[in-house]
Amino acid sequence: MAHRFPALTPEQKKELSDIAQRIVANGKGILAADESVGTMGNRLQRIKVENTEENRRQFREILFTVDNSINQSIGGVILFHETLYQKDSQGKLFRNILKEKGIVVGIKLDQGGAPLAGTNKETTIQGLDGLSERCAQYKKDGVDFGKWRAVLRIADQCPSSLAIQENANTLARYASICQQNGLVPIVEPEVIPDGDHDLEHCQYVTEKVLAAVYKALNDHHVYLEGTLLKPNMVTAGHACTKKYTPEQVAMATVTALHRTVPAAVPGICFLSGGMSEEDATLNLNAINLCPLPKPWKLSFSYGRALQASALAAWGGKAENKKATQEAFMKRAVVNCQAAKGQYVHTGSSGAASTQSLFTASYTY
């Protein structure tokens, strides 16, 4: 059956495909710097820094003004609405600083969860109303990709088929709207690590979720070559007593992806899901060394796992700028190595990089 009503022109498809490929080229990944005001406040509270717009701006300025060689490791940065319009201390927009480094600018587009009545505290995601207009404005303001996070959890009767289908369709509708406005959609269906489930249970659920997501993307005529996937790695629940090796995590993760994600998708950028910085790197490296066919780029889209050591080094003090940038650069470089399967663990990581970053029922 011929598609009589094409969703995108060949020119639109090429632009989207080119953007997606740029973000994940040569082991590059994504810095997720799209924490909301409240989430950033929790991070600042841990280092005893007040949650003000100026303090948030100062920390992000330090990250974004790092040496230009960061563009060898970071292909894209996801911003929060506030950050997109912030400037450095010289009056230059953050987004322009990033673009001049050759880094693609993205934006968080979802507007948080809303309860699904009749379920065990499951949610759907808000933000479709007015999304097309927001995307059009962001495109004018220099944004080239978007991000939308759907949350599914493993618990009694969870995730329900209703939650899976509702979130899959919402992700697909968002992706379609993004592409109509020239933005590459990052599709993020996260099976969160809360709970005591084992690795096999997480793999089973992750496969069900991803299968539903790609069915919905197909139903909505989404151009897969112009998308990126941001999934959870397949891991046991945070409260599971059995511990698994990075190789076991890798095999379960790549198997789940192999069964559900079409080869047309150019890149899969994993979220870190509250892992320590070091575990997020070790698992990504093992995934890239997994002896299964991997038709996609397998990279990272980390927030906490790129920023924890940097935030600890900063401590809210301007004189710590150099140490903060060095800590951030180190995590970016090692994750780029891991995205190529070339990371060698030396065992000399600092305390901040080995500390678990798990937060129950985590929200951005």
Swiss-Prot record:
Keyword annotations of the record: Acetylation, Cytoplasm, Cytoskeleton, Glycolysis, Lyase, Phosphoprotein, Schiff base
Modification Phosphoserine occurs at: 36, 89, 132, 272, 276, 299, 301, 309
InterPro entries (UniProt xref): Aldolase_I_AS, Aldolase_TIM, FBA_I
Residues modified to N6-succinyllysine: 13, 121, 317
GO cellular component: centriolar satellite; cytosol
Chain positions found as Phosphothreonine: 39, 119
Subcellular location field: Cytoplasm, Cytosol; Cytoplasm, Cytoskeleton, Microtubule organizing center, Centrosome, Centriolar satellite
Positions marked as site (Necessary for preference for fructose 1,6-bisphosphate over fructose 1-phosphate): 364
Active site feature: 188, 230
Coiled-coil stretches: none
Domain of life: Eukaryota
Binding site for beta-D-fructose 1,6-bisphosphate: 43, 272-274, 304
Swiss-Prot/TrEMBL catalytic activity: beta-D-fructose 1,6-bisphosphate = D-glyceraldehyde 3-phosphate + dihydroxyacetone phosphate; beta-D-fructose 1-phosphate = D-glyceraldehyde + dihydroxyacetone phosphate
An MF annotation (GO) of this entry: fructose-bisphosphate aldolase activity
Subunit structure of this chain's protein: Homotetramer. Interacts with BBS1, BBS2, BBS4 and BBS7. Forms a ternary complex with G6PD and TP53; this interaction is direct.
Function recorded in the entry: Catalyzes the aldol cleavage of fructose 1,6-biphosphate to form two triosephosphates dihydroxyacetone phosphate and D-glyceraldehyde 3-phosphate in glycolysis as well as the reverse stereospecific aldol addition reaction in gluconeogenesis. In fructolysis, metabolizes fructose 1-phosphate derived from the phosphorylation of dietary fructose by fructokinase into dihydroxyacetone phosphate and D-glyceraldehyde.
Protein family membership: Belongs to the class I fructose-bisphosphate aldolase family.
UniProt name for this protein: Fructose-bisphosphate aldolase B
Organism whose genome encodes this protein: Oryctolagus cuniculus (Rabbit)
